[in-house]
Amino acid sequence: MEGYEGINHGSVLVRVAGNEFLVDSWVASEVALPLTRAVTSAGVGAYRVRAEPFCAYWRVWWLHPAREEEHYFEVKERDVGIARVLARYESTRTDSPFNARLFARKNVTGGVVCLARGARHFRNVDGITRRELAPSDIGQVLIEDFGYPEKVVVRLPPDEP
């Protein structure tokens, strides 16, 4: 991901009938993104995503649910074996931008709701609305907007500074 050094994001590339697609739960466009040597796009509104050729692979642009500007990540490898996937997964346990604070995202009708950095964000085709939350309100948002069980929410540690 942009702004974070090293390899820090994993995506799934699939081949169907000789065509390659990106299927990425983090970007969450809800549709597969065709990957070709031309610029491609998929999704609409808050779910839109696009890819452009970059070096031997692609740069994928997406809408972050809590930030105004588009963000990107670069596809740097393909046909990665399971041993490499598991090793990268294990490395994120100690080195990830998501280890120090809570982040939740959910696609909803008309947009994306997100809880990040002590605020509730909602992105739709018109932009982003943001509501700062008191620490005591975060649990209620997780329960009401995201469907987290209360018994899980009460066990979450506070965000690190």
Question: Language-model segments: which ranges?
Answer:
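A glycine-rich helix N-cap at a beta->alpha junction
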Residues: 21-22
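Histidine-centered active-site/metal-ligand motif
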Residues: 9
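Mixed-charge, low-complexity segments
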Residues: 1-6, 14-17, 27-161
